[in-house]
């Protein structure tokens, strides 16, 4: 009873402020709205329910992931006709196990559209997970993953990535993309850390906005043939699993949910996002697919958003089979649809349709709820222009797979790679440096690209790209001397166990080190995705640790090249290496970008988008509470200590030193709600190399009615500096950007002082008047 009362109070707080009527997130288009009403009014209940069903492509043919690369997907057209006639499904998703060529995608999606138009009068809405380029189009150039995009701290890079991905998708006749991923990567062990931008809400929100604009363009009501509908995911707090394992429960306070986890989705919707995918797990004991407060009150009503909500894979039936809050499949459908789900990624259980029809006829799901859901689906199809142009064709996309997208992939990788250590300025290397390349990540494309790369787990990359440039290839391309190679440890390329290693010959690597000047040690992770990427130990593998220690023991300098989707702990040996270069998952052009940084053709400019942990039992984020800083002084509290991490959020070195000076408040040193604050700082490139450099602005509340974060990122900008050049960098903020969410679920801006920080400089601001806001600022 006590637990039930707590949940009731929490649910009440969730609704605070939601009764307001904000302006529409997307301004309605009168013509589109008239068409929506006309179409929905003309549909039968069976047709409406069919539109709410999304089926997987392998429902109509055999998965080809384990077949030779030249194997074709064979459509069972008889089955397609039968299912379309009987259930009138409105959407299809996925590739048949691995990537298809654009020449295959075009007629495949066209066939679905032809059948759907014949049976329902509406085109199919085809969805795909193209999260870093056209990931399911054969041999498509792949951008770095989202974690790299955030590490670039460059908004323009992110928008370009999305724009070019959209172009490649439409060339393949694919109009709807399940991207961006907006979960906050605040659990270091989580297997989808690399799919997300950052642990930070502000950075994630800024990148979310740019990615949605890149995918969709500037007019969400009229998506042209070069853009796609975005689908930010996984609403909400999916990455906050208590266990650190995928698809497991999260327990998150109301203020943190509202202030941090909601922020990227709000930014995406303000940018015009047309659909949202739901978190597969639960928050505070309530499966998100069953959470009316989050799906309807927060998202649809609170933001006055008329977009469409789609489930993740099988997640309605999971309310019954896994979450145990429904008595059977039918009951699970009732719960999810009434919570606010509009489309079910069923993906094979077509009984969804007759069961939902029964629920409507029994009065357990209202006709109004069905009409609302179908209106949102039809509206999305109209906004995509699918009624007038259901198909797009490769012949109309001359830049497909061209030099422009390959250059953009390279640029994104080059701006994201992060230099974390450079003892004695060992980097960059001269081209005639004698090097040994070692480690399991040295001569494979798969780890460079990560999951969702031509297949779900990314295990097909090296077969799809037999001539792809690996780190070893790129280093050889840059070196003028003979480059030695001895892996020492290799991945077994096991599809089901990404951590499987073999061919251990550390002594061979040690022997190969004789006569070289520097060792380039390529360590990290193989590719993985979702639950198969779960781990129980944050440390990098024992074999890789042993290899690192053995090479360090030779006395030759070691440059560690990290290629991993999350920050695996390396504290057992990192002090022994001379330099650390973090590549994350840099994509198909990433190896060349990394090598160009190693040899000084590119100056590294990436910064960590998350906190790189040092110890497995001392995990934290940069915006921790001050009371968490409890290192040093054994047996006593030391309130002046710092959190022990390997490298902090926002950390990143360059080959040129930068100097900050004269941090000042230009306007608004004393402010209240409604005021503008302008801050300036002088930044100088003190070196002899030109460089790009991200300037980060942190502001924290010195005293607040709830414990304030130690720091909060409030703005950033990336600027190019010539050698020796100085620039004044200005930031402009609204006073409301310094507000926080209190225990009541509302936003508050409180009277008192704030500390500004840029690099190692600080200054003060003073708020002169407390203001209490509602649900939204």
Model-derived features: positions:
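Bacterial Sec-dependent N-terminal signal peptides
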Residues: 1-26
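Glycoside hydrolase catalytic-domain context in secreted enzymes
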Residues: 18-741, 748-762, 768-769, 774-777
